[in-house]
C-alpha cells in the first residue's frame, strides 16, 4: 500500500491551498491507495474528504496536526485515528483545542486521547526527548524521517503536503500574507517549501530508507476509522412518570383535539394517520422536543410565528402548538411535510421575534446542557471579488487600482474569474503589465478556497449526549459550533432545528404590548377577524409599506390590480410574486375579476384549481392532481413533484410512464393523461409550498390589521426598527404623514430611544437626532424615570451630568423642538445655553447650599426663529421636516394659483415641488441629462429631465428654491415617475399667473363688497378677467363680472381671500 499520511487541505484555513478534490485526484493519478487528512487543530474537512476518497476507491485516514508541549519545548505531531473510538477521541481532542483556544497541546492532554491513535512526532531533536519518552509505553508512537534516533522508536517517512505542484508554492506565501495582513514578498514568493504532492517518480528519487516506507504501509493498514451517516441520534424527550414518548404524544394530541371545536371524526381520522406515520418513522421524540421549546417561548413572552415551510401541513404540529395553521381548514397536505415513502428527518423551522430568539436558545442550553447544544459553522470563501481584492492588497496595489478591480468584476452572484475574464475591460487590465498577470495567476489558484468561519444564521444542534461524541466542536462569537456544516451534521444523524429571528414578529409583539398598556385593549391575534373589509381596502389601495411580504413596489402594484377580497387572495399573491410564476399574475387577475374566463383542461381539475381560478400555484396542487388522475398516493405524488423540480431526464421519463399508466388504470385516456402530465411538469418549477404561503400570509394579514386599526402604534414601531437609516426613516415619516398621522417632534419628557405612539400622533425618537447617541439618550431617560419629568430647560440642565450635557447636545435638542413643551421659543433656549454651561448647575442638588451657590437662572425671551430657519435646522438634525415642510406650507399659501400635489396631479399640470436630489449623467451621445427626486412635502417621486429640457433648465436647477414643474407621468421599473417638460421658480410662475390669468373663481363672496368698484358688468378691454362664483351647495358656477388685471387694487383683491377660497385659471 502506498499512502500519504500528512495532507493539509484547504480547510487548514489560510495555511494550505490544496482542495480536497485535487488531493484525491492526484492520489488517483499517482496510484496512491490511502490519504490521511491532517489539518492543524481542526477537522472541518472530514466529511468532504471521506466522501471524495470513498467515491474514488481511496482509503480515507482521519488525523490532525497538533503541537505538543512540555512547557519548555514544542514538537509538531500528527495523530491518526486507528478506529472509530480513535475517531471519537479526535473529535474530543479537536473540540478541547478549539473551545479553549489552545495553541499547544500538553502531553497530559494528548495522553488522555491516545489509546486509539497513532502518534507521529516530527523533526524530533534532543530538546524533544522528554516529550517522546512520555509515550514510551504507547505501542503506536513513531518519529518522522527527519527526527533523531531514539532507542525503541520506529521511523516513518511522512511528507507534509499543502499545495499541488512545485509551481503552486506561491499560494502558501500569498495565503500567509492574507492571514497575517502583510505584503507578499514578490522576490521570494515562488520559493518551494517542499510541501507539494510528490509524484511516484519524485519519491523514488529521494533515496528514502525502505524501512521508513514500509512503516507508512503498516500505519495505513492499522487505520480503519469511518464516518457513519444517518445514525439515529435523536435525543429522547423526558416524559412525565417515564411514560413512553409514543403514549405521551398520543395522550397530549387527543386531549388537545377534544379542546378544539372541530369536526372530531374528520380530524381524528387525519390525526391517526399522521400519528402512525410519525411513530413508524420513530420521530415522536422530535415533535415533543420542538413542541416543548415553542411552549417555553409562548409562555415566556417570546412571540412565535404561525409556522414556516411545509410543517404547517401537519395536524400534529397544529395540535401541539408548533403551528397555528389548521391544515384541514386550509387544505394542506401532510405528505408535503413528512413523506412515509421517503424516510427523512422532519424539518421544522421556527420563527421567533428577533429580539428574543436568544432567550429560547438559552432555555435549550439549560435544559440539555452546554455541551449538548451548539450552533453550526459556515465558511466564507475566497470568491472572485474577494480574492481579487485580497491578492491585490498583499501585492501592494493602491486603493485606486483596487477600486478599479472591483468595478471591473460584475456584481453577479457566484461570478468566477474565468467569467470576468471574458469581459474585454477586465482582460485588458489583466494583461496591462507583468505584475497584473502575476496577480491574476495567484488569484486563480486561490479562488474558491475557504477563508474563514462564521456562524449559521439559524441552525441549532441538540442532543442528549455531549456533541463531541458525534462531531467536533469549535467556538464561535456567540457560543459553541459544530465544525461541520449544516448538511454534514444532519447527514451524520444529528437533530438540527432552525431558530430564525423575524423582525416582523418583534414589531407585532411591541404593538400588542403598547396597545394593551396604553389603551387597555388585549388583542388576541388568533381571534381577530380574517374577513375585515378595512384590511382588504388597505391592501387594494397598495398601502402596504411596512407589511411583511407585501411592501415591495411590484407586490403593491399587483394588489392594486387584484383588489383582494379574501385571505386566499393574499396567499396567492405571496406565492405568485416570484420569478417564474409572475408571468401567470395577469391570467390570475383577469380570471379573478371574471371567473367566466376560467378554463380547465379536464373537469376533474376544477375541485383542485377552483380557488386559484385554474392556475396551478401550489406544490400541493401538483400532488393532488397526481393523486386524482394517476391514483398516486400523496407520498408517491411528493416524489413525483421532487423529480419534476430536479429535471432528471431519466427519472422524469420513468415517472411519466408511471403517471400515464396510473391514469389509464384510473379510466383516463392516454392523450389527456399526457397533457395533464405536461401541465404539472410546466408548473413544477414554479409551484410554491402552500403551507408556507398560508403561514406567512397570516403574518402579513395580522400586520395589515394592526396598521388599519392602530396606525400610530404600527408606524411608531416600524420607525423604531429603522433607526439609523436616514433614508428609510424619511420614507416612513412621509408614508405616515400621507396616512394623516401627526409626527410630533422629540419631547424631552415623552420620547425615548424608540418612537413613542400616542393618541395625538407619534413622538420622534431622541435617537434620530444627529449627534445624540444611545448612551446620552439612556442617561436622559433613566433620569426621567428615576426622578420624574423635567420641569423646564434649567431643571433638565441641572439634572443631567456634565459629561452628557454638551453644547452640541443642547443645541441639537433645542433646534428639533425637544423643549418646545416648556413654552419658550427655540431662540430663547439657545440664548440660555451659556447660562447652564457657565454656571455650575451640578452642585449638590438636594443640599441647602444649592439655592445659595447657584445663580438664579433667568430666560431672556427672544422672538421665535423664522419658519424657514426652523425647517432648515430640523432637516439638518433629523434628515426630514417635523414642522410643516416648506413646500407643504407654501402650497397652502399659494394654492390659489391652481397648483397641484404629486399625488393628484395629472399630465402637464403645474406641481409645486422641491428638488431633493439632482443626479446629472451623460448619455451615449455625449449630452447631459438628469435624474431627480421631487418632494411636495408629503410625497417624493422620481423624475427625469431629458437633454433638450436639461440644457434649457440646467442653470435653474443650481438654485435652492421652490419650483413649479409639469410633464408627463410614466412608469419605470414598475415605479411612477415624471418626465419633466417645464420648470419655473414659484415666484416666476406666480408672477405670470397674476399677469395672464383668464378667470378668477371664488367660493366665498364675503369679501366682494369691499371691492365693488373694481367689478364691471361687461368686459371692456383685453386686460379684463372673468370673475366667477362657484356655489358648492348647488354645484353651480355663475359669472359675477370682470376685473382689470392692471388695476392697482388687483393684487389686494386676490390676497384678501383665503387661498383655499380662490383660484386663478
UniProtKB/Swiss-Prot annotation:
It comes from the Bacteria. GO terms for biological process: DNA replication. SUPFAM superfamilies: PHP domain-like. One of its GO terms (molecular function) is 3'-5' exonuclease activity. The keyword Cell inner membrane does not apply. The keyword Transcription regulation does not apply. It is an enzyme of class 2 (transferase). One of its GO terms (cellular component) is cytoplasm. Keywords: Cytoplasm, DNA replication, DNA-directed DNA polymerase, Nucleotidyltransferase, Transferase. It is found in: Cytoplasm. Gene3D superfamilies: 1.10.150.870, Bacterial DNA polymerase III alpha subunit, thumb domain, Metal-dependent hydrolases. InterPro entries: DNA_pol3_alpha_NTPase_dom, DNA_pol3_alpha_thumb_dom, DNA_pol3_finger, DnaE2/DnaE/PolC, DNAPol_HHH, NA-bd_OB_tRNA, PHP_dom, Pol/His_phosphatase_N. It holds the Pfam family tRNA_anti-codon. It catalyses: DNA(n) + a 2'-deoxyribonucleoside 5'-triphosphate = DNA(n+1) + diphosphate. Belongs to the DNA polymerase type-C family. DnaE subfamily. DNA polymerase III contains a core (composed of alpha, epsilon and theta chains) that associates with a tau subunit. This core dimerizes to form the PolIII' complex. PolIII' associates with the gamma complex (composed of gamma, delta, delta', psi and chi chains) and with the beta chain to form the complete DNA polymerase III complex. DNA polymerase III is a complex, multichain enzyme responsible for most of the replicative synthesis in bacteria. This DNA polymerase also exhibits 3' to 5' exonuclease activity. The alpha chain is the DNA polymerase. This is DNA polymerase III subunit alpha. It comes from Staphylococcus aureus (strain NCTC 8325 / PS 47).
Amino acid at each position: 500500500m502506498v499512502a500519504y499520511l500528512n495532507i493539509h487541505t484547504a480547510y487548514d484555513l489560510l495555511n494550505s491551498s490544496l482542495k480536497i478534490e485535487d488531493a484525491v485526484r492526484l492520489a488517483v493519478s499517482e496510484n496512491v491507495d490511502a490519504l490521511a487528512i491532517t489539518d492543524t487543530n481542526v477537522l472541518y474537512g472530514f466529511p468532504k474528504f471521506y466522501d471524495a476518497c470513498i467515491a474514488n476507491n481511496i482509503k480515507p485516514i482521519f488525523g490532525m496536526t497538533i503541537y505538543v508541549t512540555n512547557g519548555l519545548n514544542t514538537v509538531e505531531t500528527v495523530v491518526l485515528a486507528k478506529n472509530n473510538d480513535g475517531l471519537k477521541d479526535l473529535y474530543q481532542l479537536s473540540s478541547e483545542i478549539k473551545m479553549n483556544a489552545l495553541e499547544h497541546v500538553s502531553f497530559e492532554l494528548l495522553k488522555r486521547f491516545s489509546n486509539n491513535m497513532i502518534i507521529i512526532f516530527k523533526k524530533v531533536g534532543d530538546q524533544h526527548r522528554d516529550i517522546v519518552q512520555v509515550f514510551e509505553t504507547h505501542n503506536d508512537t513513531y518519529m518522522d524521517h527527519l527526527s533523531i534516533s531514539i532507542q525503541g522508536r520506529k521511523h516513518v517517512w511522512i511528507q507534509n503536503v499543502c499545495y499541488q505542484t512545485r509551481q503552486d508554492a506561491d499560494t502558501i506565501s500569498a495565503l500567509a500574507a492574507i492571514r497575517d495582513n502583510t505584503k507578499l514578498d514578490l522576490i521570494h514568493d515562488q520559493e518551494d517549501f517542499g510541501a507539494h504532492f510528490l509524484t511516484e517518480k519524485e519519491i523514488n528519487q529521494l533515496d528514502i530508507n525502505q524501512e521508513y516506507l514500509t512503516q507508512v504501509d503498516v500505519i495505513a493498514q492499522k487505520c480503519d476509522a469511518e464516518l457513519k451517516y444517518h445514525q439515529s441520534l435523536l435525543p429522547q424527550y423526558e416524559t412525565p412518570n417515564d411514560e413512553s414518548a409514543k403514549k405521551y404524544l398520543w395522550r397530549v394530541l387527543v386531549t388537545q383535539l377534544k379542546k378544539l371545536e372541530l369536526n372530531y371524526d374528520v380530524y381524528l381520522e387525519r390525526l391517526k394517520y399522521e400519528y402512525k406515520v410519525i411513530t413508524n418513522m420513530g420521530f415522536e421524540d422530535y415533535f415533543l422536543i420542538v413542541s416543548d421549546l415553542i411552549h417555553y417561548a409562548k409562555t415566556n413572552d417570546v412571540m412565535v410565528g404561525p409556522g414556516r415551510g411545509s410543517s404547517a401541513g401537519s395536524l400534529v404540529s397544529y395540535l401541539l402548538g408548533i403551528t397555528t395553521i389548521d391544515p384541514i381548514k386550509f387544505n394542506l397536505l401532510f405528505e408535503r411535510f413528512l413523506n412515509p415513502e421517503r424516510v427523512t428527518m422532519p424539518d421544522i423551522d421556527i420563527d421567533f421575534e428577533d429580539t428574543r430568539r436568544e432567550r429560547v436558545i438559552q432555555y435549550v442550553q439549560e435544559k440539555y446542557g452546554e455541551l449538548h447544544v451548539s450552533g453550526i459553522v459556515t465558511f466564507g470563501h475566497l470568491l472572485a471579488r474577494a480574492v481579487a481584492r485580497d491578492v491585490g492588497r498583499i501585492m501592494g496595489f493602491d486603493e485606486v487600482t483596487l477600486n478599479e478591480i472591483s468595478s471591473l468584476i460584475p456584481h453577479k452572484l457566484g461570478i468566477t474569474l474565468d467569467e470576468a475574464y471574458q469581459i474585454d475591460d477586465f482582460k485588458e487590465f489583466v494583461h496591462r503589465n507583468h505584475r497584473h498577470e502575476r496577480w491574476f495567476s495567484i488569484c486563480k489558484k486561490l479562488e474558491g478556497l475557504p477563508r474563514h468561519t462564521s456562524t449559521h444564521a439559524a441552525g441549532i444542534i441538540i442532543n442528549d449526549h455531549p456533541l463531541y461524541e458525534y462531531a467536533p466542536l469549535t467556538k464561535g462569537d456567540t457560543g459553541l459550533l459544530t465544525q461541520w456544516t449544516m448538511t454534514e451534521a444532519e447527514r451524520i444523524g444529528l437533530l438540527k432545528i432552525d431558530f430564525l429571528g423575524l423582525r416582523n414578529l418583534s414589531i407585532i409583539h411591541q404593538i400588542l404590548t403598547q396597545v394593551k398598556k396604553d389603551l387597555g385593549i388585549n388583542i388576541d391575534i388568533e381571534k381577530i377577524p380574517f374577513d375585515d373589509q378595512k384590511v382588504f381596502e388597505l391592501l387594494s389601495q397598495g398601502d402596504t409599506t411596512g407589511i411583511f411580504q407585501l411592501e415591495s413596489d411590484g407586490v403593491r402594484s399587483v394588489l392594486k390590480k387584484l383588489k383582494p377580497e379574501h385571505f386566499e387572495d393574499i396567499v396567492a399573491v405571496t406565492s405568485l410574486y416570484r420569478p417564474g410564476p409572475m408571468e401567470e399574475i395577469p391570467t390570475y387577475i383577469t380570471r379573478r375579476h371574471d371567473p367566466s374566463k376560467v378554463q380547465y383542461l379536464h373537469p376533474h381539475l376544477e375541485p383542485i384549481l377552483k380557488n386559484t381560478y385554474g392556475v396551478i400555484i401550489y406544490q400541493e396542487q401538483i400532488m393532488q392532481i397526481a393523486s386524482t388522475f394517476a391514483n398516486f398516493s400523496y407520498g408517491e405524488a411528493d416524489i413525483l413533484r421532487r423529480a419534476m423540480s430536479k429535471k432528471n431526464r431519466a427519472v422524469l421519463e420513468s415517472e411519466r410512464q408511471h403517471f400515464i399508466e396510473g391514469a389509464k388504470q384510473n379510466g383516463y385516456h392516454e392523450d389527456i393523461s399526457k397533457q395533464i402530465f405536461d401541465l404539472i411538469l410546466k408548473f413544477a418549477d414554479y409551484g410554491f409550498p402552500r403551507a408556507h404561503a398560508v403561514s406567512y400570509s397570516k403574518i402579513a394579514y395580522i400586520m395589515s390589521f394592526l396598521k388599519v386599526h392602530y396606525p400610530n402604534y404600527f408606524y411608531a414601531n416600524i420607525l423604531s426598527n429603522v433607526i439609523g437609516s436616514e433614508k428609510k426613516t424619511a420614507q416612513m415619516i412621509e408614508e405616515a404623514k400621507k396616512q394623516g398621522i401627526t409626527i410630533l417632534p422629540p419631547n424631552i419628557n415623552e420620547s425615548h430611544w424608540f418612537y413613542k405612539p400616542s393618541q395625538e400622533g407619534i413622538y420622534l425618537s431622541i435617537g434620530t437626532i444627529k449627534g445624540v447617541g444611545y448612551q446620552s439618550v439612556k442617561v436622559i431617560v433613566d433620569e426621567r424615570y428615576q426622578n420624574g419629568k423635567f420641569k423646564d430647560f434649567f431643571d433638565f440642565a441641572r439634572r443631567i451630568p456634565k459629561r452628557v450635557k454638551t453644547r452640541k447636545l443642547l443645541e441639537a435638542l433645542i433646534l428639533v423642538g425637544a423643549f418646545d413643551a416648556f413654552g419658550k421659543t427655540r431662540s430663547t433656549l439657545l440664548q440660555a445655553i451659556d447660562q447652564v454651561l457657565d454656571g455650575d448647575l451640578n452642585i449638590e442638588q438636594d443640599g441647602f447650599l444649592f439655592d445659595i451657590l447657584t445663580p438664579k437662572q433667568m430666560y431672556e425671551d427672544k422672538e421665535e426663529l423664522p419658519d424657514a430657519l426652523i425647517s432648515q435646522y430640523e432637516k439638518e438634525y433629523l434628515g426630514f421636516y417635523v414642522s410643516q415642510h416648506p413646500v407643504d406650507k407654501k402650497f397652502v399659501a399659494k394654492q390659489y394659483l391652481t397648483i397641484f400635489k404629486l399625488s393628484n396631479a395629472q399630465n402637464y399640470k403645474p406641481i409645486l415641488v422641491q428638488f431633493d436630489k439632482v443626479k446629472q449623467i451623460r448619455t451615449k451621445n455625449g449630452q447631459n441629462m438628469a435624474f431627480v427626486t421631487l418632494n411636495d412635502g408629503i410625497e417624493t417621486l422620481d423624475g427625469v429631465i431629458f437633454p433638450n429640457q436639461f440644457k434649457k433648465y440646467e442653470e435653474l436647477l443650481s438654485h435652492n428654491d421652490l419650483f413649479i414643474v409639469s410633464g408627463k407621468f410614466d412608469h419605470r421599473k414598475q415605479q411612477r415617475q415624471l418626465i419633466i417638460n417645464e420648470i419655473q421658480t414659484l415666484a416666476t410662475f406666480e408672477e405670470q399667473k397674476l399677469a395672464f390669468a383668464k378667470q378668477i373663481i371664488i367660493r366665498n363672496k364675503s369679501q366682494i363688497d369691499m371691492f365693488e368698484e373694481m367689478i364691471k358688468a361687461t368686459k371692456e378691454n383685453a386686460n379684463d378677467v372673468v370673475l366667477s362664483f362657484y356655489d358648492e351647495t348647488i354645484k353651480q358656477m355663475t359669472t359675477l363680472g370682470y376685473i382689470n388685471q392692471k388695476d392697482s387694487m388687483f393684487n389686494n383683491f386676490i390676497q384678501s381671500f383665503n387661498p383655499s377660497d380662490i383660484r386663478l385659471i
